[in-house]
């Protein structure tokens, strides 16, 4: 096993999955039960939509949003909006994305 680490204030939707075990492609190694585990690290303030899958060895930066049904196979930089299978960075999350709810709700 390898650790799965979440930063502060990160949330996951229903059916979130994170896999740390990596199996070899080579049949001989696989039949001998060789495998390894790679850690998964999630930064602060991340949000994962429903049915997201994260594969072994991935690091997700701070302040990321991962859209529903995404398959995360590679590292994701800070402040990224990510969607798809395989998941791709669509754009960076900026100050313009704030809804101003804090001010509206007082």
Positions of predicted regions on the chain:
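Flexible, glycine/small-residue-enriched loop-and-beta-strand segment within the central core
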Residues: 1-58, 93-94, 99
């Amino acid at each position: 096993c390898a650790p799965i680490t979440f930063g502060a204030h990160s949330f996951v939707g229903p059916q979130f999955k994170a896999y740390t075990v990596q199996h070899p492609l080579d049949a001989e190694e696989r039949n001998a039960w060789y495998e390894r585990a790679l850690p998964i690290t999630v930064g602060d303030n991340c949000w994962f939509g429903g049915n997201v899958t994260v594969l072994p060895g991935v690091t997700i930066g701070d302040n990321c949003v991962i859209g529903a049904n995404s398959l995360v196979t590679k590292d994701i930089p800070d402040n990224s909006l990510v969607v798809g299978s395989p998941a791709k960075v669509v754009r960076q999350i900026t100050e313009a994305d704030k809804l101003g709810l804090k001010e509206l709700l007082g």
